[in-house]
Amino acid sequence: MSFYVDEALAASGEVVELAVGTGRIAIPTALAGVHVIGVDSSAGMLAVCAERAREAGVAERLDLRVGDLRRPPVDERVPLVTCPFRSYLHLQDDGERLEALRAARELLRPGGRLVFDVFTPSREDIEETHGRWIEREPGIDERADWDLEAPTLTLSVRGPQGASTMTLWWVAPERWHSLLPEAGFEVLECYGWFDRRPFAGGEDSVWIARRK
């Protein structure tokens, strides 16, 4: 969380957060004094975000809009666009990835930055979790079903509030290194975690790219 807040403060301007969800990052960012335009495809999650922002006293610093990663309803041009929580993994193929990356580029001022995080699973993680229900926290179980051909992760969660399922599509870091320049970005950094350690081939990667 602090990683994205630090990036927002360094940008010195309004920030667009794609897939803002319930505001887990947007609200701390607003508390730090930054104005956030938050976009999400779920009106329900935006309603929760708005209520949390009111409770935190930062509703005036959040501008929440319903929209898609590939077509965000934003006319403003900003110094920073973020897409946290591996949200680009909801995109199913390179066509959708390029469309979303180019859309993010259009929101940026010249030299502005796109910051996002994704993952690529290790074979060990796949073997340890595939097809098994695992208790992630008391009363909440999670099951991962991996398809290496697709390649996809179908993640099922069950708990006291009910059950849900979502599918994520991942690609290797090398593919992001190719897609970003194709979409009009220069890759500035690829970290291995939010503490800014160098990427060394692990599962997680955190990207900073600049609009050309």
Residue ranges of each PLM-predicted region?
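Conserved alpha-helix/loop element of class I SAM-dependent methyltransferases that forms part
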Residues: 1-12
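Conserved class I S-adenosyl-L-methionine
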Residues: 12-21
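Conserved SAM/SAH-binding loop-helix junction
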Residues: 24
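Class I SAM-dependent methyltransferase SAM/SAH-binding core
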Residues: 27-71
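A short acidic, Gly/Pro-enriched loop at the edge of an enzyme's catalytic core
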Residues: 73-80
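A short glycine-rich, Lys/Arg-flanked "PGG" loop and its adjoining helix->strand segment in the class I
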Residues: 98-110
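SAM-dependent methyltransferase
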Residues: 115-178
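C-terminal lobe and adjacent flexible extensions of AdoMet/dcAdoMet transferase-like proteins
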Residues: 175-212
